[in-house]
Swiss-Prot record:
Protein residues bound to pyridoxal 5'-phosphate: 112-113, 185, 210-213, 241-244
Highest taxon above the source species: Bacteria
Reaction catalysis annotation: 6-carboxyhexanoyl-[ACP] + L-alanine + H(+) = (8S)-8-amino-7-oxononanoate + holo-[ACP] + CO2
Subunit and partners: Homodimer.
Protein name listed in UniProt: Putative 8-amino-7-oxononanoate synthase
Stored NCBIfam families: bioF
Record bears the keyword Cytoplasm: no
Organism of derivation: Synechocystis sp. (strain ATCC 27184 / PCC 6803 / Kazusa)
Family according to the record: Belongs to the class-II pyridoxal-phosphate-dependent aminotransferase family. BioF subfamily.
SUPFAM superfamilies associated with the record: PLP-dependent transferases
Gene name per UniProt: bioF
Length: 393
């Protein structure tokens, strides 16, 4: 539909370009969920598009905690955390995150995206340097752009290139911040964290790792990439989300007491927004407690990932490349966006919900499968059978 004012007619042209490139997206209403099975427009589908990796978003303990918090504190925090929006629940959650992550302190934001934006823009500015993995999440990229620092992307997962860039540019800048996903959200691979930590120390650089997809999924206790690599707690900055494996909403930064105190005074996306709602805060706290009591949920997730990855490997026509880590993100490629859309359509017709992932989100189109601990072997077998019959030689 055309816009009324000529000042806005470019929007229609832009949308037409997006449509021609097969990049157009729109939300679809889920009428039943969350869980491994959902209903979409009346159709029952096996859900391979959720980031509810441990199946906690519908867990009774989280629901009970959220309801209790609403009964006691209401539906909203009613102010910014530095004014009237700080509750004991927030402090309890931050202390629980810090203990879980092994850091001195933590700070909870309204989303993981805002945690990255606020932290990056608080730590660096025009006189500084950012070196970022080229496959980083949008929130890291946008935070780097907004900071005003000089931004250089390094080849994905390549510490050698990162080292070369630091040798060339580090001495020309006041501060340096290295940015990387922990588990990369579209590829499911893991950053070379031990090398990144060593490089950051060598070049007197800060290191921020976004562990959004590693929190709750990596390590025996689900504490993330640091536990996976069995690294000691260092000065580097751990960022993540409460909305994936923890089944709630919000984001966090975990690190030294000085870092967290500084962010309370300088992170605009924390200072100038209403605090996380009591329900979301209580649900996230309940999730951490549940994971610590029942680490077998992580074991079940890993078993499901292994089962699907083994099945995809057996379908040789997929040319599936198995990751050396059992991350819950797996994918198969498509030649172009149109083919990815066609594949997703066929999967849906056969009872599988796995939407197409296309540019500009990723450079190469694909179907991404997000594995949950609550998937049954039957759910995974159904997906493998559909792929076996559809995927062209």
């Amino acid at each position: 539909m055309a816009t009324g004012s000529t000042a806005y007619t470019w929007l229609d042209d832009a949308l037409e370009t997006i449509q021609r490139a097969h990049w157009h997206r729109h939300p679809q209403i889920i009428t039943q969920g969350p869980g491994p099975e959902i209903k979409l427009e009346g159709q029952r589908l096996v859900n391979f598009a959720s980031n509810d990796y441990l199946g906690l978003a519908s867990h009774p303990h989280l629901k009970t905690a959220a309801i209790k918090a609403i009964a006691e504190w209401g539906t909203g925090s009613t102010g910014s955390r530095l004014l009237s929006g700080h509750r004991q629940l927030h402090q309890d959650l931050e202390q629980a995150i810090a203990r879980w992550k092994g850091t001195e302190a933590a700070l909870v934001f309204s989303s993981g995206y805002l945690a990255n934006l606020g932290t990056i823009t608080a730590l660096v500015g025009k006189r500084d340097l950012i070196l970022a993995d080229e496959y980083n999440h949008s929130s890291l990229k946008r935070g780097a752009q907004l900071s005003g620092a000089k931004v250089i992307n390094y080849d994905h997962g390549c510490p050698e290139v990162l080292t070369d860039l630091l040798m060339k540019h580090r001495d020309n800048h006041r501060r340096c911040l290295i940015l990387s996903d922990g588990v990369f959200s579209m590829d499911g691979d893991l950053c070379p964290l031990p090398q990144l930590v060593a490089i950051a120390e060598e070049f007197q650089s800060m290191l921020l790792v976004d562990d959004a997809h590693g929190t709750g999924t990596m390590g025996k206790m689900g504490t993330g990439c640091r536990e996976h690599f069995q690294l000691p707690v260092g000065d580097w900055i751990q960022v993540g989300t409460l909305s994936k494996a923890l089944g709630s909403l919000g984001g966090y930064v975990a690190g030294s007491a000085s870092l967290i105190d500084f962010l309370r005074n300088r992170a605009a996306t924390w200072i100038y927004t209403t605090g996380l709602s009591p329900a979301d805060t209580a649900a996230a706290l309940a999730a951490i407690q549940l994971i610590q009591r029942e680490p077998e949920r992580i074991v079940q997730l890993q078993l499901n990932v292994d089962y699907l990855a083994t099945g995809l490997e057996s379908l040789t026509k997929l040319n599936f490349r198995r990751s050396p880590i059992n991350s819950p993100i797996l994918w198969v490629g498509a030649a172009n966006p149109a083919m990815a859309l066609e594949m997703a359509k066929h999967l849906r017709e056969q009872g599988i919900f796995a939407p197409a992932i296309r540019p500009p989100t990723v450079p190469h189109s694909r179907i991404r499968f997000s594995v949950m601990a609550t998937h049954s072997p039957g759910h995974i077998d159904q997906l493998l059978e559909v792929l076996d019959h559809y995927y062209p030689n």
